[in-house]
From Swiss-Prot:
Protein name, entry field: Cofilin/actin-depolymerizing factor homolog
Subcellular location: Cytoplasm, Cytoskeleton; Nucleus matrix
Cysteines engaged in disulfide bonds, as pairs: none
Note, other: The name 'twinstar' derives from the characteristic aberrant arrangement of asters seen in mutants.
Record keyword rRNA-binding present: no
Ranges spanned by the short sequence motif Nuclear localization signal, renumbered to the chain: 19-23
Gene disruption: observed consequences: Late larval or pupal lethality with mutants showing defects in cytokinesis in both mitotic and meiotic cells, abnormal accumulation of F-actin in mature primary spermatocytes, and defective aster migration where the asters remain in close proximity to each other rather than separating from each other and migrating around the periphery of the nuclear envelope as in the wild type. Failure of terminal filament formation in the ovary at the third larval instar at 25 degrees Celsius but formation occurs at 18 degrees Celsius.
Lineage: Eukaryota, Metazoa, Ecdysozoa, Arthropoda, Hexapoda
UniProt PTM comment: Phosphorylated in vitro by protein kinase LIMK1. Phosphorylation is required for inactivation of tsr and for cell proliferation and axon growth. Phosphorylation is negatively regulated by the panthothenate kinase fbl which catalyzes the first step in the conversion of panthothenic acid to coenzyme A.
């Protein structure tokens, strides 16, 4: 079900700055006036994952957000002692259980529009609490797509 919410050009530009230019570590998006997905927060390249979790929850326990993060981790190929750095972009839909039903429905029905606008994201994650959004949970989901 489409919500009719559009994605602002600023979202697309900021995404390209993360994906191609490696200019930022992450961006938090929100739905403005129930009409358009827009940029709320942009973090510089040296920002940590903990800061991302703080920013995605910053508006309060009843608020939903989207977050795009350029995630880095070390990957070890099976049968070798060599490790290599991996980078994957993931897009998170943050809709806590404490959010009102109307807001959760708006964010979940608008997630598709954002996904279609941000081509090249490797993983989509839906989180309703911190256990689903933790660094460990996200890294596990990203590693599941690695080749052994």
């Amino acid at each position: 079900m489409a919500s009719g919410v559009t994605v602002s050009d600023v979202c697309k530009t900021t995404y390209e700055e993360i994906k191609k230019d490696k200019k930022h570590r992450y961006v938090i998006f929100y739905i403005r006036d129930e009409k358009q997905i827009d940029v709320e927060t942009v973090a510089d390249r040296n920002a940590e994952y903990d800061q991302f979790l703080e920013d995605i929850q910053k508006c309060g326990p009843g608020e939903c957000r989207y977050g795009l993060f350029d995630f880095e981790y070390m990957h070890q190929c099976q049968g070798t002692s060599e490790s290599s750095k991996k980078q994957k972009l993931f897009l998170m839909s943050w809709c806590p259980d404490t959010a009102k039903v109307k807001k959760k429905m708006l964010y979940s029905s608008s997630f598709d529009a954002l996904k279609k606008s941000l081509v090249g994201v490797q993983k989509y994650i839906q989180a309703t609490d911190l256990s689903e959004a933790s660094r460990e949970a996200v890294e596990e989901k990203l590693r599941a797509t690695d080749r052994q």
